[in-house]
Amino acid sequence: MKIKLLTLALFISFCSQNIVDEGIFIETSDLNSLKTLDTGENIDISEADFLVINYWASWCLECIEEHPYLIELSKTKGFENAVYMLSFQDSRENGLKFISEYGSGNINYLVDENSKVAIYSGVFGVPETHIIKNGEVIKKYIGPISLNDLQEIINNYSHLTN
């Protein structure tokens, strides 16, 4: 019984850890195939040096939980145009209802229609947040970001936003 509990505790601990995935590059062609959630217009973020991309869905309770932290990040100096939320396996209509209900801050809401960017970025599920520098995923937060994660992002990555 103790071994089962220890195994379960280790599994839960591993699953809740932030994971660094170095070497995953997002193809430029994938980043220029995204559409805005509100108008459906094509948007090209392939030239951005620094991005914070959050994968989310309107039906995801943890996405609702972390949303205020992402809004706060989007209002932080240097991050104003760097925070993107990609709707993952969700309808545009539900995404717009989510924004209407929970607010938007300075976040850029996008649709990954075929989940192509999510798949090639190694997304496990929602919510998941990636810190991207020059197309490379340099940090992954799997699960909802917390206040501590928000502070870590601001403290560790604000110098990259220049």
Question: What positions do the PLM features span?
Answer:
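Sec-dependent signal peptide recognition
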Residues: 2-8
